[in-house]
């Protein structure tokens, strides 16, 4: 299977999000990369489903809650930027204050 670097990045984000979801289900608090992976995966999948940039920017801030993260993680994340493929092309989605 020949994958482009971008496709490899998408797969890594997806795999990291799967691991993070499993940890959340077991009650383990998320670290920085896991929180970013969950938010990023949400945005990428939402774009694939046809959701709008504005909708994903708003909804992406409600994917991970502060109580589900290790101490200090919410303060480290001021924004998450994700390049996602929408039906009309690739766009940069910025989720401001992604953990509340």
From Swiss-Prot:
Pathway: Nitrogen metabolism; urea degradation; CO(2) and NH(3) from urea (urease route): step 1/1. Gene3D superfamilies: Urease, gamma-like subunit. The keyword Cytoplasm applies. It comes from the Bacteria. It catalyses: urea + 2 H2O + H(+) = hydrogencarbonate + 2 NH4(+). CDD domains: Urease_gamma. The keyword Cytoplasm applies. GO terms for biological process: urea catabolic process. Belongs to the urease gamma subunit family. This is Urease subunit gamma. It comes from Cereibacter sphaeroides (strain ATCC 17023 / DSM 158 / JCM 6121 / CCUG 31486 / LMG 2827 / NBRC 12203 / NCIMB 8253 / ATH 2.4.1.). The lineage of its organism: Bacteria, Pseudomonadati, Pseudomonadota, Alphaproteobacteria, Rhodobacterales.
């Amino acid at each position: 299977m020949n994958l482009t670097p971008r496709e490899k990045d998408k797969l890594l984000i997806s795999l990291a999000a799967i691991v993070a979801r499993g940890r959340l289900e077991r009650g383990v608090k998320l670290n920085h990369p896991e929180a970013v992976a969950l938010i990023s995966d949400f945005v990428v999948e939402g774009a694939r489903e046809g959701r709008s940039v504005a909708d994903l920017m708003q909804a992406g801030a409600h994917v991970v809650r502060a109580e589900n993260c290790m101490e200090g993680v919410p303060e480290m994340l001021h924004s998450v930027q994700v390049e996602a493929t929408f039906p009309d092309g690739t766009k940069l989605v910025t989720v401001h204050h992604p953990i509340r």
